[in-house]
UniProtKB/Swiss-Prot annotation:
InterPro entries: Ribosomal_uL22, Ribosomal_uL22_bac/chlpt-type, Ribosomal_uL22_bac/org-type, Ribosomal_uL22_CS, Ribosomal_uL22_sf. This protein binds specifically to 23S rRNA; its binding is stimulated by other ribosomal proteins, e.g. L4, L17, and L20. It is important during the early stages of 50S assembly. It makes multiple contacts with different domains of the 23S rRNA in the assembled 50S subunit and ribosome. The globular domain of the protein is located near the polypeptide exit tunnel on the outside of the subunit, while an extended beta-hairpin is found that lines the wall of the exit tunnel in the center of the 70S ribosome. GO terms for cellular component: cytosolic large ribosomal subunit. NCBIfam families: rplV_bact. Belongs to the universal ribosomal protein uL22 family. One of its GO terms (molecular function) is rRNA binding. Keywords: Ribonucleoprotein, Ribosomal protein, RNA-binding, rRNA-binding. Pfam families: Ribosomal_L22. The gene is rplV. This is Large ribosomal subunit protein uL22. Part of the 50S ribosomal subunit.
Length: 114
């Protein structure tokens, strides 16, 4: 069974927030997944849609798969490096702000007939 893969790395959204979106489309048909993403009011839908479209394009171009028969076999989010920033506080103190990044991986496969 052939599978096509796409990875978006260093996406500047917290992995926790991206996982909320990713969990909605795991195991779904690609067209259904894109429709779900279109109507989900979360900021993470934009990079997830982009990487899903990239996986579909990879399937079509590299493996000659039928784009209408593709399903999202795997989709997961890993934590990337954290950017550390400082927020000044009262009396000369400082708090650390952690700007988290995500790596989004999508694997699509062609659904078998029957």
């Amino acid at each position: 069974m052939q599978q096509a893969k796409a990875i978006a790395r260093y996406v500047r959204i917290s992995p926790r927030k991206v996982r909320q979106v990713v969990d909605l489309i795991r195991g779904k048909n690609v067209s259904d997944a894109l429709a779900i993403l279109q109507f989900t009011p979360k900021g993470a839908t934009e990079p997830v849609t982009k990487v899903l479209n990239s996986a579909v394009a990879n399937a079509e171009h590299n493996y000659d798969m039928d784009t209408d028969a593709l399903i999202v076999k795997e989709i997961y989010v890993d934590e990337g490096p954290t950017l550390k920033r400082i927020k000044p506080r009262a009396m000369g103190r400082a708090d650390q702000i952690r700007k988290r990044t995500s790596h989004i991986t999508v694997v699509v496969v062609e659904k078998k007939e029957g």
